[in-house]
């Protein structure tokens, strides 16, 4: 059975500002199996890595007087949001901005890089990954070692219905870019993910790359809400809902509380049936997000301890801000499992 995969959530976002080339590079060096870029669109149709299209909280745009008049309010996925939006900037303008740490009060060390890092495009991220792969291959040949596994990418389409309504549909652009860089087919070393359902179904008609239905702990996929479909994320994780997902996706990416909830004191409880229900219909399970800081941990456990509980529950991979700890926990768990089997 393949070992669980370690997905670097927004890169090594525990060690550097998220969605920067430095963050992705650190994650690769830490041994992540996949790096995860969240994708949004520029005015001129370029995919760039940001967790949301409003960039006031993760760049220096608020201090850039030349862009003061770009501040506006937009309705994004049914919610009024005020700030600066990627779709109001051409790529050359976004490239003048500099990334900032999202949660400086939790990760003050990351602020040392504030002001020094650009917003990367998907093309730049893929080039970084390919370059790292080539260096690994060369090093392995020099040392007479087996060729290493490729480094995977795990892009998420952010606000796909919203961008489609602006004439900036993401699906064909994403597939074309990935194929041009050699990512194609079921073994193409890429997963494509979304919190919406319709664009995943559209992607399933464009590519054989595996798709991942992301699942929030509550609420409704925006495209279902927009169409009048009354189903919620809770409906999607019923046996009937999972069977439908299995018709267009290979995996789900649930909020981790849907796999193992916490009690009122913050301690992990017994696992739910979600992993078993997914495996029964052929879906893999990649929960999110595992973070090492105390503010995010269950009571009584560090990150390795938390991951040990989730790995024991049968997950097939996980998103983490600290890929080095994730790799260490995964390797320790799989080594221990093999030793138990051989005894």
List each language-model region with its residue ranges.
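Phosphate-group recognition and catalysis centered on beta-loop-alpha active-site segments
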Residues: 1-343
């Amino acid at each position: 059975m393949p070992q669980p995969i370690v997905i670097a959530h927004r890169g090594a976002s525990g060690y550097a500002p998220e969605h920067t080339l430095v963050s992705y590079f650190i994650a690769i060096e830490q041994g992540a199996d996949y790096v995860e870029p969240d994708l949004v669109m520029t005015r001129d149709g370029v995919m760039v890595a940001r967790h949301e299209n409003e960039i006031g909280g993760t760049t220096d745009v608020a201090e850039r007087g030349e862009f003061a008049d770009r501040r506006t309010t937009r309705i994004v996925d049914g919610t009024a949001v005020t700030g600066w939006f990627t779709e109001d900037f051409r790529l050359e303008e976004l490239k003048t901005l500099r990334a900032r740490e999202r949660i400086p009060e939790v990760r003050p060390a990351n602020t040392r890089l504030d002001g020094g890092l650009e917003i990367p495009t998907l093309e730049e991220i893929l080039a970084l990954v390919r370059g790292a792969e080539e260096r690994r291959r060369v090093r392995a040949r020099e040392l007479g070692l087996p060729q290493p596994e490729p480094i995977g990418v795990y892009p998420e389409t952010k606000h796909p219905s919203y961008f489609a309504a602006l004439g900036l549909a993401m699906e064909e652009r994403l597939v074309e870019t990935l194929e041009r860089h050699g990512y194609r087919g079921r073994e193409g070393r890429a997963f494509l993910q979304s919190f919406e359902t319709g664009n995943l179904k559209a992607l399933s008609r464009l590519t054989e790359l595996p798709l991942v239905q992301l699942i929030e702990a509550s609420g409704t996929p925006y495209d279902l809400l927009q169409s009048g479909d009354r189903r919620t994320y809770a409906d999607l994780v019923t046996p009937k809902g999972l069977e439908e997902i299995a018709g267009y996706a290979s995996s789900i990416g649930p909020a981790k509380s849907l796999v193992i909830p916490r009690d009122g004191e913050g301690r992990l409880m017994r696992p739910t049936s979600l992993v078993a229900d997914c495996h029964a219909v052929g879906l893999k399970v990649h929960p999110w997000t595992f973070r090492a800081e105390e503010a995010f941990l269950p009571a009584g456990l560090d990150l390795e301890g938390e991951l040990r509980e989730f790995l024991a529950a049968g997950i097939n991979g996980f998103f983490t801000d600290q890929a080095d700890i994730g790799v260490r926990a995964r390797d320790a768990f799989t080594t221990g499992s093999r030793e138990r089997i051989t005894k």
